[in-house]
Amino acid sequence: MKSYLFITAALSASPMLSSSAYSQIGKRFPSERKIVKDPITGTMLTFLTSTPTGDSKIYQTHNQWTSDGQWLIFRSGRVSGDAMAVNENTGEMIQITEGGYMGMLNVARKSMKLYFMRNTDITRQRSGGSLQIIEVDLAKVFADSKAGTMKPASVYQRVCGTTPPELGAGGDMALDGAENWAYFRVGPEEAAKHLLTGTKIEGDFGPRNMGAGPSGIAGMNIKTGEIKYVVSVPFQIGHIQTNPWIPGEIVFCWETGGKSPQRTWTVMADGTGLRPLYPESEYEWVTHEAVISRDEVAMAIMGHRKIPGTSGTVAPGTAVNGANPGQDAAWGSSGTREKPTGLAIVNLRTREMSIAGQTPGGSGLWHVSGSPDGRWAVGDDFSRSIYLIDRHTREMILLSAGHKETAADHPHPTMSPDGTKIQIQSAMLSADNRSMNICIIPVPETWLKRIYNK
């Protein structure tokens, strides 16, 4: 793939866009922290938020915790259009952005910083023109908010740079493992310029009319504002993520909203090494890949559909946020348990794949994560139940349930960096059975104390 550089001015301090439509950075909210016993499994759950204000966690492809391990970053209707942090120990909540954001929130692992994209024109809600990448100094926000000495937003928010409008940049963004570059999606017009002549452009795939290309990935140096082009592909890119342990290693997917002809991909930041991460068969429905350790990516090989020509019933299909999505006949014959399914883990170096576990029935595991030390894997299913797997013994338990199939979204479990707990979003406490809260589920103490024979 071709590679080239754009240069933009790095702005260390720039007047923020008008924020009259937004509340103030540093605003504090009282603790809602509650300990609730899971009514089905008995697990003690820590709800860091507990009122129906429309909370949602960061997607499981990305980091959730600040580098000091004390705060989780999330989205909330409390500050519509901006982001919040909640202290895991005290439950105190603070607004951490002002002026809005778009796309993915990127929480640094090596510093107390947050990165995200923002439209240069705040009246424009979609990508397509120039976007800014913003850095937030979280340590300064937390300290000044606590002391009651908050200053203007520009003291805490720095513009790293602005993308050229011709890139058609989108908000699907990921922070490099070295935390000096941020990678983001590029629109079809620019992406087409970097494809080899004669490359076949893919059309939409499946009933959701998604997946058509081309698209690409570019990066911005968050210290200097330099822009570099990484790669173009002939299909729609989604779920851009990075390997936190290997600088320059990128994982992304062919996004169709369901089954893809070839879901998972990887490439290096210099544009080399582009390849399918897990070469899949037409009968495999691969989804929700997430880098979980230095050498591993977890993903779900779905088993949610009825095997054609067999007895048994399947619940009526629903939209993607419902209790039984992906049942449209137009997806083809994939996603059944006629072939192996489950929570799969691919080694980026050896390219070997193993299945860590699978539920005995139902949809099978869906959104997945794992601990960096290789001990645990975790996944949810269509019922919003959470399953924990011991990767050494292959034992699997139902860890938590009762999070309501009617919830506005899926739990999206994410394992903590130290492998002791899992963050989800849950409607368990909501009277309307939809509004979600931020919840922490502990790995059982008896599991944490396990010792394995070498």
What are these regions (language model features)?
Residues 24-46, 209-215:
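Blade/loop signatures of beta-propeller domains
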Residues 25-27, 119-138, 184-212, 255-258, ...:
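Short, conserved, GDST-rich strand-edge loop motifs in beta-rich repeat architectures
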Residues 36-56, 85-101, 138-168, 220-236, ...:
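Multi-bladed beta-propeller domains
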Residues 59-62, 79-121:
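Blade-loop segments of beta-propeller domains
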Residues 62-71, 105-113, 117-118, 172-181, ...:
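Blade-terminus and WD-like Trp-Asp/Gly-His loop motifs, strongest in beta-propeller folds
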Residues 100-104, 108-112, 116-208, 214-215, ...:
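Asp-box/WD-like beta-propeller blade repeats and closely related beta-sheet repeat scaffolds
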Residues 300-312, 318-344, 350-395:
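Loop/turn-rich, solvent-exposed surfaces of beta-rich toroidal or solenoidal domains
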Residues 410-454:
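Blade-level signature of beta-propeller repeat domains, shared across WD40, Kelch, NHL, RCC1
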